[in-house]
Design a protein with these regions (language model features):
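Walker A/P-loop phosphate-binding motif and the immediately C-terminal alpha-helix
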Residues: 2-39
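Hydrophobic/aromatic beta-strand patches that form the interior of the parallel beta-sheet core
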Residues: 4, 33-35, 84-86, 139-141, ...
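Conserved beta-strand segments of the P-loop GTPase G domain that flank and frequently precede/overlap
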Residues: 6-7, 35-36, 87-88, 120-122, ...
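P-loop/Walker-type NTP enzyme "switch/lid" segment
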Residues: 8-10, 37-111
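Active-site-adjacent loop/helix micro-motif of nuclease/hydrolase catalytic cores
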Residues: 15-16, 95-99, 149-156
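Conserved catalytic-core segment of NTP-binding enzymes
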Residues: 105-192
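NTP-binding/hydrolysis catalytic cores, primarily Walker-type P-loop NTPases
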Residues: 186-209
């Protein structure tokens, strides 16, 4: 199982759209799981689904009933086309309380108890142990924009990684600037038929040939 981390220190860069398109493209040939690790994902509205549970419950089972963890995970897993996804955290407070070790344990249990080939991690700054999770990833994609503020933030992020002894994270990171894309469909299941999907295909071609 390989972990693919999608992260950006800037906002409004199509990070989640990129992550979901990547997962949908890979799921045509592989078994893929998408995990949203943001404070507020908005996926419930975008998917027009009323999630009956969320990641907080899965973390609870991870700590208190590990023998039933895979069962509970399977019962709450949803889909976008062929891409599996876990219901994201509903509460920001629940999300930020998850420790780095709990994230690592979650990934280990998924690898041990499922046949997923790839996990797409849609990452954010609020995660405990962000840099260590990025280090754990087999591939990292960082998205940016072409304006001066965005370029400066990416450069600062690079410098912080290097000064914090996470230079290995930067070395395996591929940076892409998403072009301006208009009229993305409201339905996430339609993203693979967009200009964005063609761009993502170009970005990942050499990594997944």
């Amino acid at each position: 199982m390989k972990l693919i981390g999608i992260y950006s220190p800037i906002g409004k860069c199509f990070k989640t759209s990129f992550s979901i398109v990547l997962g949908q493209l890979l799921s045509k040939k592989h078994k893929v799981l998408y995990i949203n690790m943001e404070s507020y994902s908005g996926l419930e509205k975008l998917l027009q689904k009323d999630f009956k549970t969320d990641m907080a419950e899965l973390i609870y089972h991870l700590q208190n009933s590990k023998e039933k963890f895979i069962y509970h995970m399977g019962s709450m897993t949803g889909r976008i086309g062929e891409l599996d996804l876990l219901p994201p955290f509903y509460s920001f407070l629940d999300f930020i309380s998850v420790s780095k070790d709990e994230w690592f344990q979650l990934f280990q249990e998924i690898e041990k108890g499922t046949d997923y080939e790839y996990i797409i991690l849609d990452l954010s700054d609020a995660i405990q142990g962000l840099y260590d999770i990025l280090r754990l990833c087999d591939m990292v994609y960082t998205l940016g924009r072409e304006d001066g503020f965005s370029i400066a933030k990416i450069e600062q992020y690079e410098n912080v990684l290097k000064k914090s002894n996470y230079e290995d994270v930067w070395k395996k990171t591929k940076c892409y600037t998403i072009p301006e894309i208009k009229n993305l469909p409201y339905s996430l299941s339609q993203l693979t038929y967009t200009e964005l999907a063609e761009y993502v295909k170009d970005c990942i071609r050499e990594d997944f040939e």
